[in-house]
């Protein structure tokens, strides 16, 4: 029975492991990580489904996102929490209608009259209303984890310092360590983009609101207010002044947030990279799936399915050489 190690237990690690099990049920899959949910970078995310801070081929982005949307429908069909449609406004200083909008529902370019009603700043010159989804990572990761364990998967808590030491014990190793890949495999193309957010409660807010700098995104019982996009910043200290600014600026966009109850503040680092690295490494039984920027939730299932296919091909190549 082939043995597969998946390094990293965020949403891309657990999804890749589960996709491998489903595609290759004769394999033994082990997830190895130092941190597990709810203490991963994924758990901090609001789970808005749309590509964000991810510069990659648009067709790949659309295919991966489409697969994730189908996955959300499957998750919803089981009556699980933390996944629902959300509608709202994207206001822009420069007009943009990306191709991925075709995956969204109820897309409507705002008229001048509509813009006058929703614009809050001089830079709010163009706007789009649409319906997308949110997928709250923590309950979803638990759902995936339950499936993974039911399929015979294993977990191993370990700080990974040398990938070759791990790889010796497995037929294929899958690297889903995100920003950790910078130190683990020496990929200097992956870097942190610091993000600080607030979680608040405000039932009066019914629509998401995104502009060039700030956002308010809906979840089941909370709203995520952001945010910051600080490239190459490693500081995980919560800046209280910045939290106040995030709240103030979102209130400017959505006056109803004046009544919001602040629940918590969070900061983490998005694993940014010029493109997602989803490939087998030549000459090694090593597959990479990392560098999703701010789109880890959005792209996760499409990338996981492709990752599983790559793992299958690596195993076939190894078998053919025997």
Swiss-Prot record:
Coiled coil: none annotated. One of its GO terms (cellular component) is cytoplasm. Disruption phenotype: Mutant worms (tm3673) exhibit decreased egg-laying capacity with smaller brood size and lower hatching rates at 25 degrees Celsius. Worms do not show any change in physical appearance. Glycans are attached at residues 39, 63, 175, 219. D-serine binds at residues 215, 270, 294. Its main location: other. Keywords: Developmental protein, FAD, Flavoprotein, Glycoprotein, Oxidoreductase, Peroxisome, Signal. It comes from the Eukaryota. GO terms for biological process: D-amino acid catabolic process; digestion. The keyword Endoplasmic reticulum does not apply. Residues 1-17 form the signal peptide. This is D-amino-acid oxidase. It comes from Caenorhabditis elegans. The gene is daao-1.
